[in-house]
C-alpha cells in the first residue's frame, strides 16, 4: 500500500470517527433532554395570576382563566414518551375545554425533540383518565388523529425549553411554547388548537401557566 493511499485511509477513518463521536454526543444530549422533559412537563398549571394582572391593568382582551393538567401515561402503542393533557375552565373545573395526547421523541437529526399533538377521536371515552392513568394503556393508534398545527421542535438552553414550528406556512402565526421548571408559557391559542393573534396583548402574547 503506497503512502498516499495509507494517508487517505487514515484521514477517512478520522473523519468517520469524528462524525460518529458527534452523533453519539448529540444522542446522549437529547436523551438527557428527554429525561429533563419527563420530569418538568407533568403537573398542574393555571394562569389565574396572569388573568388577575390583565384585569388590574385594564387590558381589553383579558385571557381566559384556564387550568392545565399534564400526566405521563403508559400508552406504548402511541409512543415511549406520552402525556395526557387536559385543559379546563379555571372558574368551573368541570367544564373541560380540550383533551389531547402529546408525544415526544428524539428528532431524526438528534438535534431537537419533536412533539406531536394528537386529538382523541372519542374524548368522552377518556374523561376521568387523570384519576385512572392506567386507562390509557388500552389506547391504540386508531383512537387518535393528528391535531391541528405543526409538530413542534424542542430545544433546551439556559435552564429553559423552547419549542417552535420548524416550518411555518404562509399567513400562519408561528406557534411558540416555553417551559421552565415552574412555568409553562403558550402562544395565544383558541381551543381548537390554532394560533390566534390578539393585538391588545402584543406586548405580552404568551399565556403564562404557573405550576401549582
Segments from the language model and where they lie:
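Calycin-type beta-barrel ligand-binding domains and close structural analogs
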Residues: 29-58, 65, 82-212
Amino acid at each position: 500500500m503506497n503512502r498516499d493511499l495509507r494517508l487517505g485511509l487514515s484521514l477517512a477513518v478520522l473523519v468517520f470517527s469524528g462524525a460518529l463521536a458527534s452523533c453519539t454526543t448529540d444522542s446522549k444530549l437529547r436523551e438527557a433532554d428527554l429525561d429533563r422533559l419527563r420530569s418538568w412537563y407533568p403537573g398542574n398549571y393555571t394562569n389565574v395570576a396572569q388573568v388577575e394582572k390583565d384585569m388590574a391593568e385594564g387590558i381589553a382582551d383579558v385571557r381566559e382563566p384556564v387550568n392545565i393538567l399534564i400526566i405521563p401515561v403508559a400508552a406504548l402503542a402511541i409512543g415511549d414518551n406520552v402525556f395526557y393533557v387536559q385543559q379546563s375552565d379555571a372558574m368551573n373545573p368541570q367544564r373541560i375545554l380540550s383533551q389531547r395526547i402529546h408525544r415526544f421523541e428524539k428528532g431524526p437529526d438528534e438535534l431537537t425533540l419533536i412533539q406531536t399533538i394528537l386529538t382523541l377521536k372519542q374524548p368522552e371515552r377518556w374523561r376521568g383518565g387523570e384519576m385512572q392513568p392506567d386507562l390509557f394503556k388500552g389506547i391504540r393508534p386508531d383512537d387518535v388523529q393528528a391535531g391541528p398545527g405543526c409538530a413542534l421542535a424542542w430545544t433546551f438552553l439556559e435552564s429553559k425549553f423552547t419549542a417552535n414550528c420548524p416550518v411555518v406556512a404562509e399567513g400562519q402565526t408561528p406557534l411558540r411554547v416555553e417551559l421552565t421548571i415552574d412555568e409553562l408559557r403558550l402562544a395565544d391559542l383558541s381551543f381548537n388548537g390554532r394560533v390566534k393573534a390578539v393585538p391588545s396583548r402584543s406586548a405580552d402574547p404568551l399565556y403564562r401557566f404557573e405550576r401549582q
